[in-house]
Design a protein with these regions (language model features):
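Conserved short alpha-helical segments that host acidic/polar catalytic motifs at enzyme active sites
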Residues: 1-159, 164-218
Length: 218
């Protein structure tokens, strides 16, 4: 129960509904609420867009586009991702388009009036895990985050896979790809010891790496 969580204690009593998304971002204020021809949705992303300037220039080349959210003088990459999604006729086609044109990594979480849509980046550099308990589903970058809340591992998205979560369960909207380039630093540096990625526990992997390093020194 960190100071970050307690900041929202008073707000929780005012919330209604049965779904929500959130993000702790080092760079961009998010989630963002977007109203477009695709309807209203909230969006949160995690990753690095290497060709952001190119995509911004291409988006500005058409009429009716503007970016409002700025972070340190730069375009908010979550807003850029939303702009890419809005260039197609449906949320799913828009997500697939964003996955296709983004150079780098971008995992996407959308909240619509009736569902949560999760999309792992096309090469699976970052994990997306779904937990489940008797009350519903949750989705997270780290499995330990929902373990502490009483959820059990339910599903792990593959590269580029898109799923929809509702009160009725989990539905696959786009099948996973075959190419996987998951970030190795998840096990060696970034990951929480209790977390599992692609079925491999972070703490177990670190002990194994230590054994290999020690063996090579003998």
């Amino acid at each position: 129960n960190t100071p970050f969580r307690t900041k929202f204690d008073d707000d929780m009593a005012k919330f209604s509904g049965n779904a929500g998304i959130g993000c702790i971002s080092d760079t961009d204020p998010q989630p963002l609420l977007v109203r477009s021809h695709l309807g209203m949705f909230a969006i949160s992303t995690v990753g690095i867009i290497n060709n952001a300037e190119q995509l911004v220039a291409e988006t500005f080349s058409g009429p009716g586009h503007q970016f409002m959210a700025m972070s340190s003088g730069k375009i908010n990459t979550t807003e850029l991702t939303a702009a890419l999604i809005n260039q197609r006729g449906s949320l799913i086609d828009g997500i697939r388009y964003a996955q296709e044109v983004i150079d780098g990594s971008c995992t996407i979480l959308l909240l619509t009036p009736d569902a949560i849509i999760a999309a792992r980046d096309r090469l699976g550099r970052l994990p997306v895990l779904v937990g489940r308990n008797n009350d519903g589903l949750c989705v997270s970058f780290e499995s330990f985050a929902y373990h502490k809340l009483g959820y059990q591992d339910h599903y792990e998205l593959g590269p580029g896979e898109i799923v929809k979560m509702t009160a009725d369960g989990l539905t696959q909207l786009a099948a996973p790809g075959t190419k996987m380039k998951i970030c190795a630093f998840l096990w060696t540096y970034y990951g929480y010891p209790n977390s599992n990625y692609e079925g491999v526990n972070v703490e177990v992997m670190r002990y194994r790496n230590g054994e290999i390093m020690a063996r090579d020194e003998i």
